[in-house]
């Protein structure tokens, strides 16, 4: 092998090792900060890791919202129409949060049927209209 070829091979191997190290560091950082999404059925089946930051999504079950008499604690059930889990949350819920509404909760699984949320996000459809706009449009239609 000529010295020129040896030098090119050395540069190529060095570049590949630096690129591999950078990719490994990026993947390690993503693994630490990634928040995976699970359904209530997956949580009940034990597929979600316990004591690990995840997201769970589903519909708020009817007649399941229980608010504490004092404080901001709330407990409710979410379902994917196969299984149901109990979610506990301490904080102010979004304005769109209600029974029958789709939500995404971020937090940790405490056991196969309980989830402790640190953040609750209410999902809405693309046809959502604020109540003020809806009433204004209804008034215009009546005229």
From Swiss-Prot:
Example of a GO MF term: heme binding
GO biological process, one term: cytochrome complex assembly
One Gene Ontology cellular component annotation held by this UniProt entry: plasma membrane
Keyword Chaperone: no
Residues that hold heme according to the record: 124, 128
Keywords of the record: Cell inner membrane, Cell membrane, Cytochrome c-type biogenesis, Heme, Iron, Membrane, Metal-binding, Signal-anchor, Transmembrane, Transmembrane helix
Bilayer disposition of the protein: Single-pass type II membrane protein
Primary residence: membrane
Pfam family, one: CcmE
TM region positions: 9-29
Record carries keyword Iron: yes
Periplasmic topological segments: 30-143
Cytoplasmic membrane side: 1-8
Subcellular location: Cell inner membrane
Function: Heme chaperone required for the biogenesis of c-type cytochromes. Transiently binds heme delivered by CcmC and transfers the heme to apo-cytochromes in a process facilitated by CcmF and CcmH.
PANTHER family hit by this protein: CYTOCHROME C-TYPE BIOGENESIS PROTEIN CCME HOMOLOG, MITOCHONDRIAL
Family statement: Belongs to the CcmE/CycJ family.
Protein name: Cytochrome c-type biogenesis protein CcmE
Organism: Legionella pneumophila
Lineage: Bacteria, Pseudomonadati, Pseudomonadota, Gammaproteobacteria, Legionellales
């Amino acid at each position: 092998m000529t010295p020129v070829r040896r030098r090119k091979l050395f540069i190529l191997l060095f570049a590949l090792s630096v690129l591999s190290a950078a990719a490994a560091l990026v993947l390690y950082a993503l693994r630490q900060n990634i928040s995976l999404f699970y359904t209530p059925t997956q949580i009940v089946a034990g597929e979600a890791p316990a004591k690990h930051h995840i997201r769970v999504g589903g519909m708020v079950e009817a007649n399941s919202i229980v608010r504490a008499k004092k404080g901001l604690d709330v407990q409710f059930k979410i379902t994917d129409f196969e299984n149901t889990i109990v979610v506990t949350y301490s904080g102010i819920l979004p304005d769109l949060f209600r029974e029958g509404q789709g939500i995404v909760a971020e937090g940790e699984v405490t056991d196969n049927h309980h989830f402790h949320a640190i953040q609750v996000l209410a999902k809405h459809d693309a046809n959502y209209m604020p109540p003020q706009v809806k009433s204004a449009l209804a008034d215009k239609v009546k005229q």
